[in-house]
């Protein structure tokens, strides 16, 4: 017997914020947990859609690359430069 599954529609704004907050705190390295987690806790709620899209894209990046960008060991891609500078403060 097939069990009916609820239809899933577009992600709600609230769910998106929760998902992004979780991804910020549950990274592959503790260093990035401690950098991205507090940032997400304090900033996500005030971001517009474009800023959320950019931060969401940043969360898809490799932790080792992110750490090198935030610590100044490597230059970030241009699209992330301002966000990385804000994270590094």
Task: Describe these PLM feature segments.
Residues 2-89:
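Positively charged, polar, low-complexity stretches
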